[in-house]
Amino acid sequence: MYKGKKIYIDAVRREDLPQLMLWRNKPEYRKFFREYRELNIDMQQRWYESKVLNDNTTEMFAIRFNDTDELIGCCGLCYINWIYRNADLSLYIGWNESYIDEEGYAEEGCRLLFNFGFRELG
């Protein structure tokens, strides 16, 4: 877990999947994602099992409020290239219909993700 002033990032949990799927299926969000199709729960489960649990080129995190542990979004490093030491960053805030918010949660999430990447992955 990486903790900031307002939020922290930690492992995506199986029980997070229905909420993440609802946010991901919003058309105004989906247009920005690599996966542009509407997801069903089976697709979301497959993503969790293949990418979150079993892919060494992906590190995904849930974004949660420090004070309530409420899930507010998701972020991760995708397509990690271990040779060239780089990756794509993925992040969205679903809470409060934000996508990328003005309260600074996305910015703080990026900082926490960068800290993870540089400290844990090199």
What are these regions (language model features)?
Residues 1-46:
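A short, well-structured alpha-helix characteristic of acyl/acetyltransferase catalytic modules
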Residues 12, 16, 58-60, 71, ...:
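Residue-level detection of beta-strand scaffold positions
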Residues 19, 88, 108:
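Amphipathic alpha-helical recognition patches that constitute DNA-binding helices
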Residues 23, 51-54, 117:
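Hydrophobic helix-cap positions at the C-terminus of alpha-helices
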Residues 31-33, 97-100:
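Short, polar/flexible loop-turn hinges at active-site or ligand-entry regions and domain interfaces
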Residues 42-98:
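Acetyl-CoA-dependent GNAT
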Residues 101-116:
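Conserved acetyl-CoA-binding loop-helix of GNAT-fold acetyltransferases
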Residues 119-122:
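Conserved GNAT acetyl-CoA-binding A-motif
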